[in-house]
Amino acid sequence: VLTAAYVNDLRGAFRVLQVVYGSTSTATTNNTSTFADTTLTASITPQSSSSKVLVMVSQNGCFKSGANAENRMNIRLVRGATTIAKMSGDLFLYTGNAESNGASASISYLDEPATTSATTYKTTFMNPNNTAACIVQEGSAVSTMVLMEISA
């Protein structure tokens, strides 16, 4: 039996407290094995240090240059300066000719930042082959990030 007092206790739990949306369509190139920003970022200031943040990312327009027959791309989700998740271990972009192949990477990640300070999330990418350019947001493809603060 659900009493009024019990329902009242549950009222504050697992509620969405705020939602933040970020997007970019800026084409960005990286031809090194060092992680670089994709320009996709969003910031949230949690209302409680016990809140969780659900991070949902769609990284689009992932292409390789046509100069290399084989290329890979690694994409990471970063909070502040800390990598918190791999979005793609090796997003494999392959073509046997001069044409580029495209792909997308997405992730839903439940984070526990344990802070009430402004917290910034972003994605970074690099080319482990270090031989040809990897591109995100190619052709002005839109990449998006949604941050949802969820009460504990």
Predicted regions and their residues:
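Low-complexity, glycine/proline/serine-rich flexible segments
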Residues: T29-N31
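Extended, low-complexity regulatory regions
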Residues: L40-A42
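Glycine-rich, low-complexity segments
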Residues: V1-A27, A152
